[in-house]
Amino acid sequence: MKKLILMSLFLQCLYLQVQADDDKLTTFNPVEHAVISETIAPDARSAGMGDVGAATDPDVNSQYWNPAKYPFCISRAGIALNYTPWLRQLVNDIDLAYVAGYYRIGDYSAISGSLRYFSLGEVYTDYGNSDMTVKPYEMSIDAAYSLMLSETFSIAAGIRWIYSDLRFDYSEDSKPASAFAADLAMYYNNYVMMGNRECQLGLGMNIRNIGSKISFYGDEESQFIPANLRLGASLMIPVDEYNRFTITADANKLLVPTVPRQQEGESNSEYQDRVRKEYSDVGSIKGIFQSFSDAPGGFKEELEEIQWSVGAEYVYHDQFSLRAGYHHQAESKGNLKYFTVGGGFRMNVFSLDVGYVISTARSNPLDQTLRFTLAFDMDGIKDLLKR
């Protein structure tokens, strides 16, 4: 197998750590795809609540979670800088940087965009007769337009260019890979009465990365990009004029087909032919629909492909925030299970947020992962300059 594919598989192994005993886990069958960095939560606020964001209050980093939320933002514009030192339990030079921003057009629409850069640090290799150092990385650039159709409902559409250079060598048959994708999102936000309290209900949906397959060595080895469907709900409960709580939950499913499992009595050549017909030769759009019914374990395994996240946020005086959450993934699909905590501080001009991962498994490389977000409110900056 070519070194590039080995690099991709190595990255997946870093991300999908299985911590279950063999007696408890009889089948490990994760959904395989390229560009793993596209699935990493980029910002500290959502990461501090267990990786939720489809229906939370709109913020500057909504581009990743649900761009349809932007028309509901209070500020006219904003920009955020996000940084995550990734897998620090294993290596010290893998990092994710993410920049997002938006601008509201009038009262009912907004444009937004983001830049994601995932660095795998330096990799030393003795390919051929010479030693060399390569710096593999992945990146993406996207833009979206969101429109409020009513006072409570909005939609959004986005486009994305994805670029991946995971080469260990620079031979003629190797090349960086790229793909194009689109997003479709919806958001509902309304007030509901619970007793004598006027609470805020949010519902969201985001279908992300609907697009082409990505190929490093030609169409014969093309891989799926991580298309996914995210559904979320949130409820903000005011306590008094200065205090409020928000509880929220997300369900996320990869819209990528599952690699067929080799059957008893099936030869290796027969199995490879079936994998090619039922998986490798499947187009990206067909693969989205196929992903709902192709799990070898049937409906039970399809349910296991859904990742669940729950979170809560406490806000005091719109300035101080405390957050907590939990993220769950089935053992057979990757076993990413962890608690998260976080906090934030906000002023008129800027806000600073931090998120922290606490793994339920002792040897999970995601344990103790930190995320940092520095966001700027353009209305606040404008008011400051007028003084």
Model-derived segments and spans:
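Positively charged n-region of N-terminal signal peptides that target proteins for export
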Residues: M1-L4, E151
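Sec-dependent N-terminal signal peptides
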Residues: L4-L14
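Subset of outer-membrane beta-barrel
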Residues: D21-R387
